[in-house]
Amino acid sequence: MALGAAYHHYLQLAGDHGTATHALLLGVLIFLVIRLVSARRTGTTSANKRKQQQRLPLPPWPPGKLPIIGHLHLIGAETHISIRDLDAKHGRNGLLLLRIGAVPTLFVSSPSAADAVLRTQDHIFASRPPWMAAEIIRYGPSDVAFVPYGEYGRQGRKLLTTHMLSTKKVQSFRHGRQEEVRLVMDKIRAAATAAPPAAVDLSDLLSGYTNDVVSRAVLGASHRNQGRNRLFSELTEINVSLLAGFNLEDYFPPNMAMADVLLRLVSVKARRLNQRWNDVFDELIQEHVQSRPSGESEESEADFIHVLLSIQQEYGLTTDNLKAILVDMFEAGIETSYLTLEYGMAELINNRHVMEKLQTEVRTTMGSPDGKKLDMLAEEDLGSMPYLKATIKETLRLHPPAPFLLPHYSTADSEIDGYFVPAGTRVLVHAWALGRDRTTWEKPEEFMPERFVQEPGAVDVHMKGKDLRFIPFGSGRRICPGMNFGFATMEVMLANLMYHFDWEVPGSGAGVSMEESFGLTLRRKEKLLLVPRIAS
C-alpha cells in the first residue's frame, strides 16, 4: 500500500474522533516519510563513499612480491630497521603496504597516519587480528590487550582504569615498590663495598625488580612464597617468546602444509604454557577466596586478585576472564618497565654528561642540612625532578619497549591520506620509527633528555597518546592502561640508582653495546654489567 493510500485509510478508520487524531496521524506519517528518505540518502551516501574509496589507490608497496610468501623475503632479522628502510625507499606519507604471506599488512610511520589509525578512525582500526598463540595463552582471548574490540574490551578497560590501575590505586602500591627498591639497593651496596668493588648484573637485578613489583601487586606480600616470583618471570619470558615478531602461522592459509605444521607446533607450546598459567592461577585464586578481606577499600594495598574477585559479579567475569587479565598484568608490567630501565642505564653510561647532570639534580634536590645521605628516596620526593622524568621520556623515545604497537585490524573499508585501506588489513604502527623521525626530532639519534625539559625551545610532547610523535604506550581506544604503574615503577628505581651510586664499565671499557634483538619487545643482546661505587 502506498503511503498516501495508507494515510487516507487510517483517516477513515479514525472516523469522527476529531482533529486531534487527524493531527496525530499526520505527524506519524511525516515522521515515517522523513525516516525513509533519510535512510535512502544515508544508504546512497554510504554506497557512494565506498565506491569512491575503492577507486582510490592502495598504499604504496615495494616491487618484488613473490608467490605464497609475498614481501616476506624483504624483511630482515632486525624487522624494525628493515621496515624503516623500506618505507624510506617505497613508502609515502608514512604508509607502506606489504603482503606478508596471504595477509595485507599496512605499516604506519608518520604522526599524521598514526593519528588516522589511532584517533580519528580508531572506531575502524581498534580491533585485533586473529592471533592463534594469543588466543590460547589468553583464554579466547578474553584479556584486554589482545581481545578484538567490542563491549567486552570496553568493559575490561573500564575495569582496569577504575579499579586496578587508577592513579589512586597505583599510589597505594608505593610502599611495596619502595621495599623492592630497597632490596635491590642492598644488593648493589654489597657489591660496591667489596674490595675491590664487584660488577653487578643490572639486567638481572632490574628484571627481578620489575617482576617482584608486579608479582607483589598481583598477589600481595606472599609473592616470594615457594619461588612464585621466579615462576612468574619464567612464564612471562615464554609468553614473550611465543608472541615475538611475525607469527607466521597467522599469515598463511591454514590448508597450506607449511602453515599447518607451524600451527601445530605453536599450538602445542601455547597450550602447554596455558596449562602452567592455569595451575598457578587456580591455586592463587583459591587461596584468595579463602582469605578474602571484608570491607577492604581501594585505598589499601589490596592486591589485584582480591580486587578482581571483589568485582567479579559486577562485571560478569568468568574465572578464565580473571586469569587472562592477570596474564596481561604480568607480561605488560614486567617486560616494559625492565627494558626501559636497562636501556636508560645503558644510555646514561654511554652519555656521561647526561648521567652527571641527572645525578646532580637528584643529589642536590635531596640534599640534607646535616650533610647525611638519605637511606632511601621515596616516591613523594621525586616531584621536583624534571630532568629525571625527561630522562625516562628520552629513553622511551629512542627505545620504546615494543618497536611496533600491538597489531590493529581494519573492520571496514577506509581512507588514509588519499589511499584506500580495505577491510581485513592488519595495521602495525611503527613506534620506534616515530621516535626517530628526522622531520619531527632534532638530532633524533642522540640521547638528549633536555628536549623534554619544559624550557624555551624544548619539545612540548605529551607522553600519554595525545601527541602522535611520541607514543610508547600507544594512543586512542587501545592505549596502554598501565602507563602510570609503569612510570612509577621506573622513576623510583632510576632515582635511587643515581642517588646512591656512581657507575663504571668493568675493565677499561668506555661504553656498552646497544646492539639489539628484535621480537615482540626490543632487547639489548648483551647483559648490562656495571661496577657501582658508593657516591660521596
Curated annotation (Swiss-Prot):
Cofactor: heme
Membrane topology of this protein: Single-pass membrane protein
EC number from the UniProt entry: 1.14.14.157
GO molecular function, one term: oxidoreductase activity, acting on paired donors, with incorporation or reduction of molecular oxygen, NAD(P)H as one donor, and incorporation of one atom of oxygen
Reaction catalysed by this enzyme: indolin-2-one + reduced [NADPH--hemoprotein reductase] + O2 = 3-hydroxyindolin-2-one + oxidized [NADPH--hemoprotein reductase] + H2O + H(+)
Gene3D superfamilies: Cytochrome P450 (1.10.630.10)
PROSITE patterns assigned to the protein according to its UniProt record, in alphabetical order: CYTOCHROME_P450 (PS00086)
Gene Ontology annotations for the cellular component aspect, listed alphabetically: membrane
Pfam families assigned: p450
Pathway given in the UniProt record: Secondary metabolite biosynthesis; 2,4-dihydroxy-1,4-benzoxazin-3-one biosynthesis; 2,4-dihydroxy-1,4-benzoxazin-3-one from indoleglycerol phosphate: step 3/5
Cell compartment(s), UniProt: Membrane
Ranges that cross the membrane: 18-34
List of residues binding heme: C480
Family to which the UniProt record says this protein belongs: Belongs to the cytochrome P450 family.
Descriptive protein name: Indolin-2-one monooxygenase
Organism: Zea mays (Maize)
Lineage: Eukaryota, Viridiplantae, Streptophyta, Embryophyta, Tracheophyta
